[in-house]
Amino acid sequence: MITSMISYPSLTTTSPIFDAGIPSTDKNMLGEQIGELKGKTMGQRVLDSEGPRMETTLSSTGSVRGTNVKETVTFVGSPISAGVLHGEGHGVLMGGESEMATFRGEAFGRISSSGSVKWRGAHFYRTTSSTGKLAFLNNVVGVFEAEIDAEGNVTEKIWEWK
């Protein structure tokens, strides 16, 4: 049985409840970082002022598992509470030997006092190729964090979700 140590200022105890015999490799759902991209907001438009709902298109370049890629994403964001946005969108990654991977994504964004929005969410990838440098993305879920600053600059990091 695997046990964990819980440490408090005046108390130390061992408890099998936390690990329950689960191998440590199965407890970590966040896999390796598979991508890092930087780019720019290309355009925005208001879809509905009674929400409001805004459509945003981003264009980024970077690397996905060592392959240079270009990413284009269009998403719709709308406020769900004070300072919090919900976004849903679609994207395309192009790289390698004319390879392409598509994805659907969903995220929550938090608006900072500086005007930037920090997004946390997931991409659900699909490819039609079984070979090539982006083929590994087929049916992969990638969790991401992205930031769009007040000037429209975008940074994004993606990890595989095991």
Residue ranges and their predicted role:
Residues 8-162:
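Beta-strand-enriched cores of mature, soluble protein domains
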